[in-house]
Amino acid sequence: MAEERQDALREFVAVTGAEEDRARFFLESAGWDLQIALASFYEDGGDEDIVTISQATPSSVSRGTAPSDNRVTSFRDLIHDQDEEEEEEEGQRFYAGGSERSGQQIVGPPRKKSPNELVDDLFKGAKEHGAVAVERVTKSPGETSKPRPFAGGGYRLGAAPEEESAYVAGERRRHSGQDVHVVLKLWKTGFSLDNGDLRSYQDPSNAQFLESIRRGEVPAELRRLAHGGQVNLDMEDHRDEDFVKPKGAFKAFTGEGQKLGSTAPQVLNTSSPAQQAENEAKASSSILINEAEPTTNIQIRLADGGRLVQKFNHSHRISDIRLFIVDARPAMAATSFVLMTTFPNKELADENQTLKEANLLNAVIVQRLT
């Protein structure tokens, strides 16, 4: 036993270069375990010159300068590797004043991850929380992402031929929410949802969204879209592609319009044929004709498809034609309309002109609703 302790003492001194009394102190504290004593010596701030420990028998220890075997790892190597890993996560370290062990240490800001590393983290986090990789399938237009289960009623068949079938009502959905299917596309410089705009990875407002994806959770903004329903989220890897906004889907016109060839919408005429004839006769008698002056016949094509022909003096004005139309069709009194010529097609804006001044003698006038 004494000889083994002397060998351990000599090897400790040879490895560390410490004095014999100090070496004996560390060995006695470690129960004469050489490896524990050496570890305690360096943890206590021993000599900075760390010498590689060979795994050979302790009878022949050399302090030569020959290169150590690749299979041997020193305490300094372990500490150095750990420091490198921490620097990658925490940022570069700087020392102000003194040496490495006595100076002030300053840790720089964390190193920003590249888009590739960020996308890898998102996919890795999603898989760790149950996401499954699937092949991309091209859907035909109009195909839904998930078939809807039948929720109606039906008849339960009887157990015997003479037993009547019983009607079974379908169960109503327990919630009023709607299922939402969203495609998350991860691009080179950002991400997009469905056919939306590009959102940058570096934008602080998107940090919470990306962190939720990495933890395998549905982001809050997608849960709000579902209104309590289920959210189906697909992730697509486009990290090697630049973002290109897809063309908007074609939407058919759903408004109202007019049939081609129709000058204006038709006006409903609720008057009976007898009442209409009476109104036209009354309107015609309201136009006072001076037989001593020149006269002309004006043909008027109404917006309701009707046609009127009335005699006027050359001195009558365009406003008189308007009054004649209103008297012949009382329903037109509450309708806004203009009078136009047929060829050339122009609006008769100045209704104070006489028929002769407006060159409307024996003309055809068209009524157009506005």
Curated annotation (Swiss-Prot):
Post-translational changes noted in the entry: Phosphorylated during mitosis. Phosphorylation inhibits interaction with Golgi membranes and is required for the fragmentation of the Golgi stacks during mitosis.
Keyword list, A-Z: Chromosome, Cytoplasm, Cytoskeleton, Golgi apparatus, Lipid-binding, Nucleus, Phosphoprotein
UniProt-listed SUPFAM superfamilies: NSFL1 (p97 ATPase) cofactor p47, SEP domain, UBA-like, Ubiquitin-like
Domain SEP, first and last residues per copy: 179-244
Effect of residue 272 to A: No effect on phosphorylation
Outcome of swapping residue 343 to S: Reduced interaction with VCP
Impact reported for residue 301 to A: Reduced interaction with VCP
One Pfam match: UBX
Impact noted for substituting residue 57 to A: No effect on phosphorylation
Effect the entry attributes to changing residue 112 to T: Strongly reduces nuclear location
GO biological process, one term: positive regulation of mitotic centrosome separation
SMART domains, A to Z: SEP (SM00553), UBX (SM00166)
Positions where Phosphotyrosine occurs in the chain: 167
Family (UniProt): Belongs to the NSFL1C family.
Protein name in UniProt: NSFL1 cofactor p47
Source organism of the structure: Rattus norvegicus
